[in-house]
Regions:
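Active-site-proximal cofactor/substrate-binding loop regions of enzyme domains
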Residues: 1-5, 27-34
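Charged, low-complexity intrinsically disordered regions
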Residues: 66, 70-74, 78-239
Length: 239
C-alpha cells in the first residue's frame, strides 16, 4: 500500500541518518522531501465547488496523515493550514519575485538534532497590461525544505541550476567553483565561500546521486547551505 511504502522509506531514511557525515546530509535532504511529496498535494487554484479528488485530499491531509505521523517517536507535526514565512524563503536567495504563497507545512524534530521543515510553495512575478489587468508569471512551484543542522557551519554554498532558471535566479556575489565532474557542471553552477569544503561536500558519489535523481525523476532542484541550514527547493509542481 501507499502507506506501507511510505513507512518503509521513512524508516530507511531515519536509519541512514545514524551514519551522517556533513556530506550525506545532502542525500537526506533529497530523501526526506521525496517521501513526503505524495502527501503535500493541495491545488493552488481552487474552484468554488470542490471536486471528489480535492475532498479526498483534504480529508487525507487533515485526518489520515496526522494519525499516521503520530506513530513515530520523532516529533512530527503536519499543519496543512500553516505556511513558511517569506523571510525564511528569502534567506536562501533563490530568486527575486513579486508574490509568494505557502501552505501545507510539515515539521520534524529528529532525535539526532536535525530539524526539518517543508512546505508547498509558489512564487510569481506580476505585470500589468495597458488595460490595467494584472498577470502572474510563475517562477517557482513545488516543495521548499529547510534542514537545521545541530553543528555550526559558517561557510556558504549555492547549488544553482546551470541553464534553465539562470535568468530568474539571484547570482551570488561569491566565487564560482569549478569541479572535476563535467557532467555535474552541465546540471549545476556551484558558488561557495570555501572551495576546499565544497570539494569535501560534493564528493563523486554525492554528485552522481544528484545527477541520477535529476534524470530519474525529471524534477529540477536547487540548494543553499548557509547559517547551519540547508535550504532546498524542488520544482515538482503539484504532486
Amino acid at each position: 500500500s501507499i502507506v506501507g511504502a511510505f513507512l518503509i522509506m521513512l524508516i530507511l531514511s531515519f536509519f541512514s541518518i545514524v551514519f551522517f557525515t556533513i556530506a550525506s546530509v545532502f542525500v537526506f535532504a533529497v530523501i526526506i522531501v521525496v517521501i513526503a511529496m505524495p502527501y503535500i498535494n493541495k491545488k493552488y487554484n481552487r474552484e468554488n465547488k470542490k471536486s471528489d479528488i480535492e475532498l479526498y485530499v483534504e480529508q487525507y491531509k487533515n485526518i489520515i496523515i496526522p494519525e499516521f505521523l503520530n506513530q513515530f517517536e520523532e516529533k512530527i507535526n503536519y499543519m496543512p493550514n500553516e505556511k513558511i514565512d517569506k523571510t525564511i524563503y528569502d534567506e536562501a536567495e533563490f530568486e527575486k519575485y513579486d508574490t509568494y504563497y505557502s501552505e501545507d507545512v510539515m515539521k520534524m524534530d529528529l532525535n539526532n538534532g536535525f530539524n526539518v521543515i517543508m512546505s508547498d510553495l509558489k512564487t510569481c512575478n506580476t505585470t500589468t497590461d495597458d488595460n490595467g489587468h494584472t498577470h502572474y508569471h510563475e517562477l517557482f512551484k513545488g516543495i521548499f525544505t529547510i534542514i537545521e543542522m545541530p553543528k555550526t557551519f559558517n561557510e556558504i554554498l549555492y547549488l544553482k541550476k546551470d541553464k534553465k532558471y539562470k535568468r530568474k535566479n539571484i547570482i551570488p556575489k561569491i566565487e564560482k567553483i569549478k569541479l572535476d565532474s563535467t557532467d555535474f557542471e552541465n546540471y549545476f553552477d556551484i558558488y561557495s565561500t570555501n572551495s576546499l569544503i565544497t570539494m569535501q561536500l560534493l564528493t563523486s558519489d554525492i554528485m552522481e546521486f544528484f545527477i541520477d535523481f535529476q534524470n530519474s525523476t525529471g524534477i529540477d532542484f536547487e540548494l543553499t547551505l548557509k547559517n547551519s541550514r540547508i535550504y532546498i527547493r524542488f520544482f515538482s509542481g503539484n504532486i
